[in-house]
Amino acid sequence: MDKQYVVALDQGTTSSRAIVFDRDANLVAVSQREFTQIYPKGGWVEHDPMEIWASQSSTLIEVLARAGIHSDEVAAIGITNQRETTIIWDKLTGKPVCNAIVWQCRRSAAICEALKAQGLEPLFRDKTGLLLDPYFSGTKIKWILDNVPGVRERADAGELLFGTVDTWLVWKLTEGKVHVTDPTNASRTLMYNIHSGEWDSELLKALDIPASLLPEVKSSQAVYGTTRIAGEGTEIPVAGMAGDQQAALFGQLCVEPGMAKNTYGTGCFLLMNTGKQAVKSEHGLLTTIAVGDDGGISYALEGAVFMGGATIQWLRDELGLIRDASDTEYFASKVDDTNGVYLVPAFVGLGAPYWDPDARGTLVGLTRGANRNHIIRAALESIAYQSRDLLDAMSKDSGVALKQLKVDGGAVANDFLMQFQADISGVEVLRPAQTETTAMGAAFLGGLAVGFWSNVDEIRHKSGIDRRFVPLMDDKERATLYLGWQDAVRRSLSS
């Protein structure tokens, strides 16, 4: 039967999803299953790897049924995933040695501090482009080896395997035949040298992690193995893989240097493709790996804002100022400006470019005339201001003045926010017609790997624009407003 579809598996932090795309990159069907969030202690976050697999495999079966298609019509299954989340399992039984340690989990903070005290942060920064932070996989692995009884001995004996979620899914899909990851996921582990494209023995020694745990690193645009849906039917290639933010970058076809996208979710993730040059940031950004137009390694600068959509949730859940996130556009548009009010949502500290974990939220500029609408508008504007901070840092690091910003994520439906983002940044904001850009990135990678699409040029026109938001604010007003934001941020910083 003619293969007319590609399936993307989108394994996220709170749910597993499967999406079917046709040859024109139209979304045909979606299936989604949430799974349990486990919080054993303050600052600890876990997932059950078997529940991740159960939720993801069931969505795969379900989405084909919803689309009304058979497995022999599927050209490839591509994968995108929550990055950094760490799983270790027995290579013979497939049983995890403990729950997955999620990217949000802070339990390995003491390990990071010990490595910093040894003066090792510059080494890790130079080789991986990352900071020594519990966010990344390497110190999570070390924590498991040091704290779960018997695991280090089993690891040293070669009995165990490590993987981020992509690796775990491929291993399960191929029934334990394939232990593999891609460069985008490997680059988030603190163990992968982004310049040589290899696991780094010096970093492994510093972390005391045996190399036998690690998966083979293959191209993001490769065929890794095959799978049968529910153990039946045609063998489908498992092909194409990238971490969620890099998949979104590719789904937005930001494959050339200077192209950037911002994902507006709980937080915001802004990535700029820097081509074949790994740009070392001097302004608080991470250097990471992206997927090039040939499927090979490109580099990117990445900045993360901790509180994006979560700021709007705070307005709703803690302050009761709105009933639904969509209400913000209505209330913000009822006033001409914020009446001098700025909200800095540093509720869990500030991420890039400040990296101040002890910064705290501030609401400044309040006068007797300030009302609910001004505060709601200030909350929305804070998302755009924080993104402007990242854009400015990227321009300084890369030497490229951005002209366009591609956007995705739930908050891009808010026209007020998108227009203010364009205004305060002085760049054109492009909202795609297809908002499932992360899944589309995985689908594109899978389809390209098996020849479903021949090259990036063939898929370029399949990614249309819903609306262009052009800057309408004059330079003087933009500068004045941004100075006010910078002053508000200074008040929120810990020192």
UniProtKB/Swiss-Prot annotation:
Biochemical pathway: Polyol metabolism; glycerol degradation via glycerol kinase pathway; sn-glycerol 3-phosphate from glycerol: step 1/1
EC number assigned by the record: 2.7.1.30
MF annotations from Gene Ontology: ATP binding; glycerol kinase activity
Binding site for ATP: 13-15, 266, 309, 313, 410
GO cellular component: cytosol
Binding site for glycerol: 83-84, 135, 244-245
Pfam families: FGGY_C (PF02782), FGGY_N (PF00370)
Activity regulation statement: Inhibited by fructose 1,6-bisphosphate (FBP).
Statement: the UniProt record of this protein carries the keyword ATP-binding: yes
Entry-linked InterPro entries: ATPase_NBD, Carb_kinase_FGGY, Carb_kinase_FGGY_CS, FGGY_C, FGGY_N, Glycerol_kin
Binding site for sn-glycerol 3-phosphate: 13, 83-84, 135, 244
Chemical reaction(s) catalysed: glycerol + ATP = sn-glycerol 3-phosphate + ADP + H(+)
Residues binding ADP: 13, 17, 266, 309, 410, 414
Protein role: Key enzyme in the regulation of glycerol uptake and metabolism. Catalyzes the phosphorylation of glycerol to yield sn-glycerol 3-phosphate.
HAMAP family registered for this protein in UniProt: Glycerol_kin
Full protein name: Glycerol kinase
Organism ancestry: Bacteria, Pseudomonadati, Pseudomonadota, Gammaproteobacteria, Alteromonadales
